[in-house]
């Protein structure tokens, strides 16, 4: 045994094989204590097993397990974790904050054991699957209820093996306010058709949202997005080096956008700017760098 302890009314043990076992103290039902992580603080107050994150290879559980309202950073940095089978029957209907829960779980190949999670009360999903670089698709999340989510920042950023977003096509994003870095450096994505029905009418910020998606060849999946309340679009498509055209975005409402710095910067294949002339950029503070490193900026001065 490497370590053991108690979280709320759940006892846990981590054995020499890397198996993290959770079971209720009374053998029947238990609830985790809420996360104590203070973001941007040097005073780390995560779960006790976070100290051994690199040794955790699989998770198992027995009895009825209830997730706390705040489960942020619960398995942060479990870079050797390959199985989530112990989580499939967890009661998650009280969860509000799942931020960074599986952040930097490099070797997770699928999320099948999370497919039945009740996420109807979750508000914060930021960094939830950040740097899950072995994930190839998100089909397991297709039934997640995201109706109350407000923050999706960096949710799938650096998921470099993701090839499509079909699993997200029915997500309810009505209440999301921030989508910064959501798909940042998802370098294997070739299209965005899976999110074409997303309601983005309340989103305020989309900075770096698709930056580094170097395999994207078109933006047709975004043509019907409502961007009427977006203020920040800086670096949104930066280094989408396979994009040849932005014509699909011709009907975007950019009347409230104030920052577009390097929005299409380093889009080295971009040759067709048809559609950009339709945009209202009256409130944009600096227009000179929108197409930095890809076209003559004099056109937009």
Task: Identify what each model region corresponds to.
Residues 1-301:
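Negatively charged
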